[in-house]
C-alpha cells in the first residue's frame, strides 16, 4: 500500500499544493478550481517571506529578500555583519539607560527577527533574550538588536 502525504498550505489568498504525485496535485487543483477562481503562478518561488529553491533532493527555504527588506527598513544596508553571538553572560538592564524613542520600531524589528529564526536558528538565543524588553526598550537594547540585522 502506497502512503502519500499531500500538503496544502493556505494563507489568505495564497495556496501552495505539493506532493510527490503530480497527478494528485493536478486533481486537487482541478477540484479547488471548481469552487474557487484560481490563478496558477507555476512552481513555488516565494511564499510568506520565504524563497523556495527546488533541488534534486528536495526544497530549500531561505529568507534573503526578507533579510534585505529588514536591513533597508532599519537603515543597516551599509554596515558589515557581526558574526559574534550575544554572550549568555551579557547583562542588559531593563531599567537603566535612555528609553528608546520608537518602541514600535523595536517591537516590529524583534518580530521580524523572531520570524528569521525559522531559517537562521543560531540567532534564537539572542533574539529571545532581546525580546524580554518589548514593553520599554532602551537605546542600548536597540543597539544590541542592530547587531543581528
Where are these regions (language model features)?
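Long, low-complexity, charge-biased intrinsically disordered regions
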Residues: 1-149
Amino acid at each position: 500500500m502506497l502512503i502519500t502525504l499531500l500538503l496544502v498550505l493556505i494563507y489568505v489568498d495564497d495556496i501552495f499544493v505539493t506532493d510527490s504525485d503530480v497527478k494528485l496535485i493536478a486533481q486537487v487543483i482541478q477540484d479547488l478550481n471548481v469552487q474557487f477562481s484560481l490563478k496558477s503562478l507555476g512552481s513555488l518561488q516565494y511564499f510568506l517571506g520565504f524563497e523556495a529553491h527546488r533541488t534534486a533532493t528536495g526544497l530549500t527555504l531561505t529568507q534573503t529578500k526578507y533579510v534585505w527588506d529588514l536591513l533597508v527598513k532599519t537603515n543597516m544596508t551599509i554596515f558589515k555583519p557581526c558574526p559574534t553571538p550575544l554572550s549568555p553572560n551579557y547583562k542588559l538592564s531593563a531599567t537603566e539607560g535612555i528609553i528608546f524613542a520608537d518602541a514600535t520600531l523595536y517591537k516590529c524589528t524583534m518580530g521580524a527577527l523572531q520570524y528569521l529564526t525559522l531559517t537562521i536558528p543560531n540567532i534564537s538565543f539572542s533574539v529571545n533574550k532581546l525580546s524580554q524588553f518589548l514593553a520599554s526598550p532602551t537605546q542600548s537594547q536597540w543597539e544590541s538588536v542592530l547587531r543581528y540585522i
